[in-house]
Design a protein with these regions (language model features):
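Short helix-loop-beta-strand segments that form the rim/entrance of peptidase-like active sites
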Residues: 47, 301-326
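Soluble metallo-hydrolase cores and metallopeptidase-like ectodomains found primarily
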Residues: 29-31, 106-143, 206-285, 297-300, ...
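Second-shell loop/turn segments in exported
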Residues: 32-40, 54-64, 116, 127-132, ...
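Active-site-adjacent substrate-binding region
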Residues: 181, 187, 191-192, 251, ...
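Metal-dependent peptidase/peptidase-like ectodomains
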Residues: 107-109, 122, 127, 217, ...
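Extracellular/luminal Protease-associated
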Residues: 63, 112-216, 283, 389
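Noncatalytic luminal/extracellular "stalk/propeptide" segments of secretory-pathway proteins
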Residues: 22-30, 50, 54-162
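N-terminal capping segment at the start of a domain
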Residues: 24, 29-63, 200-208, 277, ...
Length: 472
C-alpha cells in the first residue's frame, strides 16, 4: 500500500510539469496551413518592398529620407489594415557621408573605388600602403611600425549559406581602424566585407576605441583590393584617401509599429519585424526592405482572418539598426522594463538577412523545455515550405537581440544567405535582386510562425533576467 501511495505521489508531482507544456490546438494548425498556402500565392510582400525602395529609396538613419521612411511606414501599416499604428522615438548620433575619393599616386597612378566606413571622420591622408593578410597580422605588427602609413587589411570573405564568415570580415571593419591607429597609421583601408567580384565597395559601421584619435577609414571594392594587392607586391605603393564625412550632432527617428489586436490576450504580443533604415549607397532592398515587407505582409494576412489570434501580432519597423541597434535597444527599454513586461512578450523574430528562402527553424529562451512541443508543431506546418526543424541551432535577429538579452523568447527563421554578401551594404542592393517567389516563401513562413505562436496554449519561456542588451 505504501508503494502505491509513493507511486501516486510521484505521478501527481509530474502533473504540473505536464500541464505546463505549451501546445497548439488542431484547429489553429489547420488555419495556419491555409494561411501558408494563401501567402505563397499573395504578392503583398513584393508590393511593399517595391513601394519602399521606389518611393523612399536609400534611407540612412538621420538623413533626409529618414522622416519620409517613417511616414511611409505609418501609412503602409494603415493601408494594410493594422488595428493600431504608432511610433516610438529613437535618438542616436548622426553620421553623414558627403564625398569620398581614393587613388594610387606615383608611377602607377590610378583611381580606386572606395566608400567611407560609417563612423569614419573626414580628412585627406597620403602615405605608403602596408598590406596585411588579415586582422591578426595587423594586430601582430610592431608598435610604431605604421607611422605615417596607411594600413590595408586584405581579408577575403568566403560564401556560406549562413554567412558565417561575416564574423571575420566584420571584425576587420569594426576593429581594424583602431588597431591600425595604435600602430601609428594615418589611415585605414580594407577589402570590402563581401563575397562579390563587382567594383562596388561595401560600407558598414566602424567603432574607434576610447583613447584612439579617429583617422579616415574606408573599404575598397573587391576588384580594387585585388589591384592594390598586386601593386604592393610590385613594390612601395602610395595612396591618397580623401573623405568628406563625419558625425554631426544627434538625430531622432522612430520605431514604427503596427499591431493586429489579439482576441483574448491582447496585451501579450508576438513581435516580428525588420529594420526600416538602410545605408545610403543602394535602395536597401535586401537590407532590410525585404524584412520590413515580409513581416508587414505576414501581419496583414493574419489580420484578414475572420477571427484574430489569441495574442496580438506586433510588427516593428525598427529605426537605425545599421549604426548600432538603436531601434532594438529602444524597443527593449520601452517594453522590457521588468518581469511584468517580459511576461507579455510571447516571442520575437526579426527578418534581417535578405530575401533568400528560409531553410531552418527553431525557438529559444531562458526556459525553452516547456515549449518544445509547440515548436515542433510549428515546424511541421513549416515543413512543406522546405524548412527543417533544427533544435540545437539559431539565435535572435539583431533588433530582437536586446529584448532577448533581457530574457525574451526568440524564434530563428534562417534565410539562405549564400549570395547575401555579394550585395550587402553596396550600391547593388536594389529591388531587382529580390526573387518574388522566394520572398513569398518568407512571408508564408513568418505568417505561420506568428499566427501559431499567438495561438499557443502556453508561452515560449520568456523570463526576466538582469543582463545588459548587446552593444551592437
Amino acid at each position: 500500500m505504501r508503494r502505491l501511495a509513493v507511486a501516486i505521489s510521484a505521478l501527481l508531482a509530474c502533473t504540473p510539469a505536464l500541464a505546463a507544456q505549451t501546445t497548439i490546438a488542431d484547429g489553429a494548425l489547420r488555419t495556419a496551413a491555409q494561411l501558408r498556402e494563401q501567402a505563397l500565392a499573395d504578392t503583398t510582400g513584393f508590393a511593399v518592398v517595391e513601394s519602399l525602395t521606389t518611393e523612399v529609396g536609400p534611407r540612412i538613419a538621420g538623413g533626409e529620407a529618414d522622416p519620409r521612411a517613417v511616414a511611409w511606414a505609418k501609412a503602409k501599416f494603415q493601408s494594410l489594415g493594422f488595428d493600431k499604428v504608432w511610433t516610438e522615438p529613437v535618438s542616436f548620433p548622426k553620421w553623414q557621408r558627403r564625398s569620398e575619393q581614393a587613388a594610387v599616386i606615383g608611377a602607377h597612378a590610378q583611381p580606386l573605388h572606395i566608400t567611407a566606413l560609417g563612423g569614419s571622420p573626414g580628412g585627406t591622408v597620403e602615405g605608403e600602403v602596408v598590406r596585411f593578410e588579415n586582422l591578426a597580422a595587423l594586430q601582430a605588427a610592431p608598435a610604431g611600425s605604421l607611422a605615417g602609413k596607411i594600413a590595408f587589411v586584405d581579408y577575403q570573405m568566403t560564401k556560406a549559406r549562413d554567412g558565417k564568415d561575416y564574423g571575420n570580415g566584420g571584425a576587420v571593419r569594426s576593429k581594424g581602424p583602431s588597431e591600425a591607429i595604435r600602430k601609428g597609421a594615418i589611415g585605414f583601408v580594407m577589402r570590402s566585407a563581401g563575397t562579390d567580384s563587382h567594383r562596388v565597395p561595401h560600407t558598414g559601421i566602424t567603432r574607434f576605441d576610447e583613447g584612439v584619435t579617429p583617422a579616415p577609414a574606408a573599404a575598397l571594392s573587391v576588384p580594387d583590393a585585388n589591384q592594390l594587392a598586386r601593386l604592393t607586391a610590385l613594390g612601395s605603393t602610395r595612396v591618397r584617401l580623401a573623405l568628406d564625412c563625419g558625425w554631426d550632432g544627434t538625430a531622432t527617428s522612430y520605431n514604427v509599429i503596427g499591431e493586429i489586436t489579439g482576441r483574448s490576450k491582447p496585451k501579450e504580443v508576438v513581435v516580428i519585424g525588420g529594420h526600416l533604415d538602410s545605408w545610403d549607397l543602394g535602395t536597401g532592398a535586401i537590407d532590410d526592405g525585404a524584412g520590413v515587407a515580409i513581416t508587414m505582409a505576414a501581419g496583414h494576412l493574419i489580420g484578414q482572418l475572420k477571427q484574430a489570434p489569441k495574442r496580438s501580432i506586433r510588427v516593428v519597423a525598427f529605426a537605425n539598426e545599421e549604426q548600432g541597434l538603436y531601434g532594438g535597444k529602444a524597443y527593449a527599454a520601452a517594453h522590457g522594463k521588468d518581469a511584468k513586461d517580459m511576461a507579455l512578450h510571447q516571442i520575437g523574430a526579426e527578418s534581417d538577412f535578405g530575401a533568400g528562402r528560409i531553410y531552418a527553424f527553431n525557438t529559444g529562451s531562458a526556459a525553452p523545455d516547456a515549449s518544445r512541443a509547440a515548436t515542433r508543431q510549428i515546424a511541421e506546418v513549416l515543413a512543406p515550405l522546405g524548412i527543417a526543424y533544427e533544435p540545437s541551432k539559431g539565435g535572435p535577429g539583431p533588433d530582437v537581440g536586446p529584448i532577448s538579452a533581457k530574457g525574451g523568447a526568440w524564434a530563428w527563421l534562417a534565410q539562405d544567405g549564400t549570395d547575401y554578401f555579394d550585395l550587402h551594404h553596396t550600391a547593388d542592393d536594389t529591388l531587382d535582386k529580390i526573387d518574388p517567389k522566394a520572398l513569398a516563401q518568407n512571408v508564408a513562413a513568418y505568417t505561420v510562425f506568428a499566427y501559431l505562436a499567438a495561438e499557443a496554449d502556453g508561452d515560449f519561456g520568456s523570463r526576466a533576467k538582469s543582463v545588459q542588451p548587446p552593444s551592437e
